[in-house]
Protein backbone atom coordinates (compact mmCIF):
# COMPACT_ATOMS: atom_id res chain seq x y z
CA UNK A 1 0.00 0.00 0.00
CA UNK A 2 1.42 3.37 -1.02
CA UNK A 3 1.91 6.02 1.63
CA UNK A 4 0.12 9.30 1.03
CA UNK A 5 2.47 12.06 -0.11
CA UNK A 6 2.15 15.82 0.12
CA UNK A 7 4.00 18.43 -1.91
CA UNK A 8 5.42 21.39 0.00
CA UNK A 9 6.66 24.53 -1.79
CA UNK A 10 8.56 27.45 -0.24
CA UNK A 11 6.69 30.58 -1.38
CA UNK A 12 8.12 33.21 0.98
CA UNK A 13 11.74 33.97 1.86
CA UNK A 14 13.19 32.89 5.19
CA UNK A 15 15.08 36.18 5.54
CA UNK A 16 14.03 37.87 8.77
CA UNK A 17 12.38 34.79 10.25
CA UNK A 18 13.23 33.05 13.50
CA UNK A 19 16.20 30.69 13.53
CA UNK A 20 14.06 27.69 14.48
CA UNK A 21 11.68 28.42 11.58
CA UNK A 22 14.66 28.43 9.19
CA UNK A 23 15.75 25.09 10.61
CA UNK A 24 12.24 23.70 10.12
CA UNK A 25 12.20 24.80 6.47
CA UNK A 26 15.57 23.11 5.98
CA UNK A 27 14.22 20.00 7.70
CA UNK A 28 11.39 19.90 5.17
CA UNK A 29 14.01 19.72 2.41
CA UNK A 30 13.44 23.23 1.09
CA UNK A 31 16.31 25.50 0.14
CA UNK A 32 15.59 28.26 -2.35
CA UNK A 33 12.41 30.19 -3.01
CA UNK A 34 9.90 28.15 -5.04
CA UNK A 35 11.72 24.90 -4.31
CA UNK A 36 9.45 21.91 -3.73
CA UNK A 37 9.68 18.69 -1.80
CA UNK A 38 7.45 15.60 -1.76
CA UNK A 39 7.11 14.19 1.73
CA UNK A 40 5.25 11.29 3.30
CA UNK A 41 2.21 12.54 5.20
CA UNK A 42 3.02 11.87 8.87
CA UNK A 43 2.07 13.73 12.06
CA UNK A 44 5.68 14.95 12.42
CA UNK A 45 5.72 16.44 8.93
CA UNK A 46 2.27 17.99 9.49
CA UNK A 47 3.58 19.65 12.66
CA UNK A 48 6.58 21.07 10.83
CA UNK A 49 4.33 22.45 8.10
CA UNK A 50 1.99 24.01 10.66
CA UNK A 51 4.94 25.75 12.32
CA UNK A 52 5.99 27.48 9.08
CA UNK A 53 2.60 27.66 7.35
CA UNK A 54 3.11 31.36 6.56
CA UNK A 55 6.16 30.45 4.41
CA UNK A 56 4.96 27.39 2.50
CA UNK A 57 2.19 26.16 0.21
CA UNK A 58 0.90 22.59 0.59
CA UNK A 59 -0.69 20.47 -2.15
CA UNK A 60 -2.15 17.00 -1.98
Swiss-Prot record:
Instruction: Cite the Gene3D superfamilies for this sequence.
Output: Ribosomal protein L30, ferredoxin-like fold domain (3.30.1390.20)
Question: Tell me, what is one Gene Ontology molecular-function annotation carried by this entry?
Answer: structural constituent of ribosome
- Give the Pfam families listed for this entry: Ribosomal_L30
Q: Keywords of this protein's UniProt record, alphabetized?
A: Ribonucleoprotein, Ribosomal protein
Q: Which GO terms describe its biological process?
A: translation
Name the family. Belongs to the universal ribosomal protein uL30 family.
Subunit text = Part of the 50S ribosomal subunit.
Quote the protein name from its UniProt record: Large ribosomal subunit protein uL30
- List the source organism: Dechloromonas aromatica (strain RCB)
Q: Which gene encodes it?
A: rpmD
Amino acid sequence: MADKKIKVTLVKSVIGTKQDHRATVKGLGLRKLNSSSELIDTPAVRGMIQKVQYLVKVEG
